[in-house]
A protein has these predicted regions:
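Conserved beta-loop-beta/alpha segment of the NTase-like Rossmann-fold superfamily
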Residues: 85-203
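Short, flexible, glycine/charge-rich loop motifs used to bind or transfer phosphoryl groups or to couple energy/partner
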Residues: 1-2, 132
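Generic secondary-structure transition motif, activating predominantly at the C-termini of alpha-helices
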Residues: 71, 75, 79, 89, ...
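Conserved alpha/beta core of the MobA/IspD/sugar-nucleotide pyrophosphorylase nucleotidyltransferase superfamily
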Residues: 3-8, 188, 194-222
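Acidic-enriched, low-complexity/disordered segments with a strong bias for Aspartate over Glutamate
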Residues: 5, 27-28, 53, 60-62, ...
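N-terminal glycine-rich phosphate-binding loop and ensuing alpha1 helix
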Residues: 2-87
Length: 222
């Protein structure tokens, strides 16, 4: 069996801290972006459309019960929606499991951000998979943001490229997630470990808006 058979793409949907810019008592990701889909569901559908084998939502611990109730524990692979030629379509559907992770208590108020949520979900997904089988260990991670500008149905048209790629990122007007745009991207296990080391070595424990410098007096510890 070749190594390609063991490729495992895990979707990650990071949520921010539980306060809301709209003064809601729940995460802003629950806001509808269409009549039937909210922002979190849109991000999950994008992961499913990209061909993820499982999806991990990283959120504040207090939000997990509401997420489980509203989001559920699985999503259908949309590529099977239009297979009307199947004799029994209901038997050929693929269900992608949805799991939930949360930041450790010591990280709350210090590292609970989109970036750390991605790292945390990546490590939790890897640890759980490794405890089951080495063949389930994810080799790549697909990150989708709830407030992304990406059309969540679009990735299914690029599955071949996604499956064969290592690192990959969406661009818009020449910008990517590296420009602080909420655009989806794929990173590897090596990137995950490197990002974790970088946070531990260079993290300050401070919150700072992207446009502010280190010497700005307006930024402070949470």
């Amino acid at each position: 069996m070749s190594s390609i058979d063991h490729r495992h793409l895990v979707g990650i949907v990071p949520l921010t801290k539980p306060y809301s810019i709209y003064n809601n008592t729940w995460d802003d990701g629950f806001i509808n972006i269409s009549e039937t889909v909210n922002a979190i569901q849109g991000a999950i559908l994008e992961c499913a459309s990209a061909g993820c084998d499982s999806i991990w939502v990283n959120a504040d611990y207090e939000q997990i019960p509401l997420l489980k109730k509203k989001i559920g524990s699985w999503v259908e692979d949309p590529i099977y929606y239009c297979r009307t030629f199947e004799k029994r379509p209901s038997l050929t559907k693929k269900y992608i499991p949805i799991f939930y992770s949360w930041n450790h208590q010591k990280d709350v108020g210090r590292r609970d951000s989109y970036g750390w949520g991605i790292i945390n979900a990546g490590f939790v997904a890897s640890k759980v998979a490794a405890n089951i089988s080495k063949h389930l260990l994810p080799d790549r991670f697909y990150v989708s943001f709830p407030f992304s500008v990406t059309n969540f149905w679009q990735p299914q048209h690029h599955r071949k490229k996604i499956n064969l790629s290592g690192r990959l990122c969406f661009t818009h007007n020449g910008k990517t997630f590296l420009d602080n745009e909420m655009l989806s991207f794929i990173f590897t296990q090596e990137d995950l470990r490197s990002a974790n080391r970088n946070v531990k070595e260079k993290g300050t424990g401070f919150y700072m808006p992207v446009t502010q410098g280190l010497n700005d007096p307006d930024w402070s510890k949470p």
